[in-house]
């Protein structure tokens, strides 16, 4: 199970919760630093009602500002966000008021599928407060979930590349529910600390942003005002302060897989003759080494339940086809291995015997390692062994420097190795420069002499609402 309840309901008498006595923080007035209310045990049931007494002590985020289609105007529809934490999780209750409740768009559908069709609210948590990477949790008025990782430094396909490229492949463990009423809708969210990575320090601050989209008119608003004149949206977020002694608890997930099969065939007398039974065993494990480092391991993984690839035409193609990664083992921590131009293609590990992966962040250094054995489909061919190292260091407010080293070895004289580096620099408040270089070294005696190649890449972007590139 990857998520809690994701079922909304329609009600004219939905409880909107007790009136909070907590402080209000107006985004439009610049009250963007929020001391986080802490309760011993919230005892909150995620049912889309927010009627527990614990909500009365929550901090309230108010006064959203529109950023689409008109920037800087007060939000046309009011939104209030209540937030608090207890020993094990962070909670949100979001009241999305709407003066045309019949115009609320909401469908009960698949996870991660509604952001282009439904109204929704979105919580963005920058747990390392580094303004580079954040968790995204979105919920529509029916309680359906969308989650992913927000990565600064790439193009999202909007004007001038403004906006985060949200990777919605990762699925996290969290709960949501919602209720639609005659005044709008209410969303409740619970995110356990064990589902998040964050620094191992006694006291910490998190970046926070809450946004809302009204689908019928395309209006988008945010608690912390945002402008396209600044290239990094996470630098425009608010702060949750005073988070003390957060304990993610022990995170250990073990998923054994056992499959069996038995074949039979008709003999010459048209009798069905069964063969001997056969079986296979596999194991997947995820372990939280610390609150900011995760170890994944797999043995003989079974990917039969993974979503099938969309069909592609392979006739008269000069280049190899590209397929997105959907296998769970390779999805954890994918943001660590991302680069301006893709050098890491884990789908080339087609039939893994086993593997291990370590991803996370230590101080200002992002680290990632993948090691795997790839079994040959042909009995006469040797197996392949893959090692991948990646480091990326935060530089300045939004910049970074990184290096990557993928190595694929079949035998001592059969290999492909790549060494690459990348940099992202933010100049002033509007310009972003991205640089990347890599060298490839291959040897295969069956095809002749060793080969090598190089690539260089650069990009400059200007953020702006009226002029961008």
Regions found by a protein language model. Give the residues of each.
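Short strand-coil-strand connectors
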Residues: 361-363, 428, 463
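Structural preference for beta-rich elements and adjacent junctions enriched in aromatics
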Residues: 1-394, 399-402, 413
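Long, charged, mostly alpha-helical binding arms that flank functional sites
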Residues: 410
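C-terminal, active-site-flanking charged/polar segments
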Residues: 211-215, 459-465
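Transmembrane beta-barrel architecture of outer membranes
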Residues: 276-284, 351-355, 382-390, 398-406, ...
């Amino acid at each position: 199970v990857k998520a809690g309840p994701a079922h909304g309901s329609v009600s004219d008498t939905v409880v909107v919760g007790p009136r909070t006595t907590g402080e209000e923080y107006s985004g439009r007035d610049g009250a963007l630093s929020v001391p986080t209310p802490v309760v011993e045990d919230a005892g909150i049931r995620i049912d889309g009602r927010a009627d527990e007494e614990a909500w009365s002590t929550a901090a309230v985020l108010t006064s959203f500002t529109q950023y689409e289609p008109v920037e800087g105007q007060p939000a046309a529809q009011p939104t209030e966000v209540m937030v608090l934490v207890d020993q094990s999780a962070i909670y949100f209750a979001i009241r999305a008021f709407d003066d045309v409740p019949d115009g609320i768009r909401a469908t009960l559908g698949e996870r991660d599928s509604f952001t282009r069709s439904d109204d929704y609210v979105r919580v963005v948590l920058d747990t390392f407060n580094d303004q580079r990477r954040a968790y995204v949790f979105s919920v529509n008025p029916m309680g359906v979930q969308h989650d992913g990782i927000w990565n600064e430094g790439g193009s999202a396909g909007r004007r001038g590349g403004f906006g985060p490229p949200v990777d919605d492949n990762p699925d996290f463990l969290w709960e949501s529910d919602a209720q639609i009423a005659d005044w709008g809708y209410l969303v409740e969210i619970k995110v356990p600390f064990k589902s998040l990575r964050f620094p191992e320090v006694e006291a910490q601050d998190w970046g926070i942003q809450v946004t809302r989209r009204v689908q019928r008119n395309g209006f988008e608003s945010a608690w912390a005002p945002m402008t396209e004149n600044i290239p990094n949206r996470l630098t425009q977020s608010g702060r949750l302060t005073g988070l003390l002694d957060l304990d993610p608890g022990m995170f250990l997930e073990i998923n054994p897989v056992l499959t069996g099969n038995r074949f039979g065939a008709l003999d010459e007398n048209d009798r069905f003759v069964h063969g001997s039974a056969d079986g296979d065993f596999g194991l997947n494990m995820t372990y939280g080494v610390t609150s900011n480092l995760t170890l994944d391991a797999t043995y003989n993984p079974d990917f039969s339940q993974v979503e099938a690839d969309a069909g592609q035409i392979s006739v008269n193609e000069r280049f190899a086809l590209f397929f997105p990664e959907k296998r769970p083992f390779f999805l954890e921590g994918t943001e660590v291995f991302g680069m301006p131009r893709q050098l890491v293609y884990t789908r080339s590990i087609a039939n893994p015997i086993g593997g291990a992966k370590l991803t996370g962040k230590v101080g200002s250094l992002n680290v990632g390692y993948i090691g795997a054995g790839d079994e040959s489909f042909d009995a006469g061919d040797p197996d392949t062994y893959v090692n991948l190292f990646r480091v990326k260091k935060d530089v300045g407010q939004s910049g970074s420097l990184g290096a990557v080293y993928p190595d694929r070895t079949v035998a001592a004289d059969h290999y492909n190795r790549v060494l690459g580096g990348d940099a992202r620099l933010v100049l002033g408040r509007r310009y972003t420069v991205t640089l990347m270089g890599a060298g490839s070294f291959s040897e295969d005696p069956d095809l002749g002499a060793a080969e090598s190649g190089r690539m260089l890449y650069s990009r400059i972007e200007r953020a702006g609402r009226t002029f961008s590139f």
